[in-house]
């Protein structure tokens, strides 16, 4: 339903998006282009469909990306923009010693608590906030799953610098995205995702080198990229 009601409508303006180099929310929904989530979250029903869609993605793909690296040395995890907590659930299932804080906007957190919370697992908690503005929870590891591809390089750099400042010494960040090949000419699925980012967000999919170029200036080192063989890949960097 989310694809039919939001994504498909934006793709009707693909040619304009390519010419203008920006998303098509203004033409499609009358929403200013910089207000990325106003269209996605334009009603309670649309927000719920979006969160359910992301939850379905991580129920299929989550374990693979979280197992790309051994994350057991990171007992305290913060999932920034973690929506329903679906990826957090996969993380606590895979790593018995970890606790995960899901950090997202207040409306999202409240909906997650109503529809998706896991009261039987005390290792998952929710915290409200805007990761561009509000203090970030201290953690050993930050998960950024399908977050950086929403934003410009400048906004990604600002967010990564904030994460580095909040991260415990010796901790790290796990970026989960669909990686382009080094020359940017594939995989085809990732190229299509990048076009989708163009019509709907301020961002794009990136190559491993482009992610390194964002992470290193923010202060991260030992940056490792791993293909998972699935839809999404993993990048681990240390503070």
Model regions and ranges:
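Conserved Class I S-adenosyl-L-methionine-dependent methyltransferase catalytic core
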Residues: 1-75
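Alpha-helical subdomain
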Residues: 71-239
């Amino acid at each position: 339903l989310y694809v039919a009601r939001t994504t498909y409508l934006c793709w009707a303006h693909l040619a304009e998006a390519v010419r203008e180099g920006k998303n098509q929310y203004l033409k499609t929904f009358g929403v200013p282009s910089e207000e990325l989530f106003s269209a996605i979250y334009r009603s309670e029903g649309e927000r719920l469909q979006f969160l359910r869609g992301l939850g379905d993605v991580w129920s299929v793909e989550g374990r693979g990306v979280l197992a790309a690296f051994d994350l057991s040395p990171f007992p305290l995890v913060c999932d920034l923009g973690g929506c329903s907590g679906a990826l957090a659930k996969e993380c606590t299932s895979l790593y018995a010693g970890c606790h995960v804080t899901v950090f997202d906007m207040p409306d999202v957190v409240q909906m997650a608590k109503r529809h998706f919370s896991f009261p039987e697992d005390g290792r998952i908690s929710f915290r409200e906030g805007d990761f561009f503005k509000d203090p970030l929870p201290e953690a050993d590891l930050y998960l950024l799953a399908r977050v950086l591809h929403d934003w410009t390089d400048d906004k990604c750099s600002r967010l990564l610098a904030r994460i580095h400042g909040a991260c415990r010494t010796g901790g790290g960040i796990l970026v989960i995205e669909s990686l382009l090949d080094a020359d940017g000419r594939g995989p085809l699925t990732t190229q299509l995702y990048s076009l989708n980012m163009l019509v709907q967000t301020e961002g794009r999919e990136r190559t491993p080198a482009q992610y390194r170029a964002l992470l290193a200036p923010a202060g991260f080192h030992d940056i490792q990229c791993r293909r998972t063989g699935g839809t999404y890949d993993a990048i681990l960097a240390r503070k």
